[in-house]
Amino acid sequence: MNLFPRLLGDVGGSNARFAWQASASAPLSHIQVLSCSQYLGIAEAIEAYLTGNGLTSPVAAGIGIANPITGDQVVMTNHHWSFSIEQLQQQLSLNRLQVINDFTALALALPCLTTEQKVQIGGKEPIQNAPVALLGAGTGLGVSGLMPSGQHVLPISGEGGHVTLAAQNAKEFAVIELIGQKYGH
């Protein structure tokens, strides 16, 4: 299946970053950051990106989004956008659309880093084939990881900013109770 040209996206609660890749060996081009608040939905942001850069329709797209992906329907946690992955694929006339959690995408890229690009935290010597954690702040708190599995790694998805907290005292319990009333945690 031909997957080029393709659109690549990193969608957060505040910004949507898009890039174009014309072929497998081509560098990323037309890199642009759009404010999510300026568009009704992800389809409108993508169409504005394509039109604004004079690009034709992509054949495929890969999007990392700051949200759990548990099925076809995506309802963003930190923004008002919601969409069906299948309907977005049809609307954009894509042969293939892959939507995954943004930090899962970052975790899957970790094996591509060179030794010089990595920083070890703690310990004396790196442990080969050990689990790897990834943590980063954006509009929310992204977390992910990689778990070794034979010759491969398996990504572990998570939403660090949406975890249930354990209270250590009455004051913390009261704060968590208020948060729970508003957000359901």
How does the language model describe each region?
Residues 2-52, 154-162:
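Short glycine-rich, Thr/Ser-proximal phosphate-binding strand/loop in the N-terminal lobe
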Residues 9, 101, 137:
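Active-site flanking residues adjacent to catalytic metal/cofactor-binding acidic residues
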Residues 54-99, 104-117, 134:
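Short beta-strand-loop/turn "lid" adjacent to the catalytic site in phosphate-handling enzymes
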Residues 123-133, 140-185:
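Glycine/GP-enriched mid-protein hinge/lid loop-to-helix segment characteristic of carbohydrate kinases
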